[in-house]
Amino acid sequence: KLGQKLCSKKAGGRVPEYQRQELPDATKWDHTKWSPNYRNDNRIETHESGTAPCKTACPAHVAVQGYLKLAAQGRYDEALALIKRENPLPAICGRVCNRRCEDACTRGRVDAAVAIDEVKKFIAQRDLDAATRYVPPVVTPTRAGGFDQKIAIIGAGPAGLSCAFYLAEKGYKPVVFEKSERPGGMLTYGIPSFKLEKDVIEAEVEIIRLMGAEFRYGVEVGRDVTLDELRAQGFKAFYVAIGCQGGRLAGIPGEDAEDVTVAVDFLRE
């Protein structure tokens, strides 16, 4: 019967007393009920440092929750500027990112993770389609003629492009040497166009060029020009970003047969 278990034999047949909970609308709020440091102390569903799980999971540590809020408010240019603080290639990443942020999104425990990568892709695509694109502000040197230190970046893959972006942002004029005829490294030669369009890569590189970086294609450092020769030309610093584009076979019989090749070489060709 309904309520038959309310009586306890241990209580002598009496109905046990249950602790009453104070309802929020009947609570008198004072300094003992809340903390002025709530925003800093409340770290439920966050990393130990207080950082949101999505930002912690992101290899670039992009301020995910920040640009999502800006996008929700329709402030797309500000959202793009915030993304580019940590990720200079958002249009590329919006297409090929493996979405670790969404794997860590706590909304996924309720229904589905926030579509973080799609929002980033939308913000970046909006900029690609704009008549006037967003070019991050560059530090203006106080001395006449700007910074005179010449910096060489060897390789125009993701690492080399990122280095060129942040150096240009700080007011330097880096020179990027790339042995291929197009920038991007494995972005260009390792990812098929149906997944990542080549014109998207070119568009991202164009922004870095507008910021002040110089690109020299078809120049292989070590063969066409040596480091000593570059030093003689006045280069004071070098950033080596030649990549690690080696492939590997499956380790099965017959892999040494004629016309058997690794995936990296196949994609490049």
Label for each model-derived stretch:
Residues 88, 157-158, 182:
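Residue-level detector of alpha-helix initiation sites
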Residues 149-175:
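N-terminal Rossmann-like FAD-binding beta1-loop-alpha1 element of flavoenzymes
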Residues 175, 214-218, 261:
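General small-molecule cofactor/ligand-binding pocket signal
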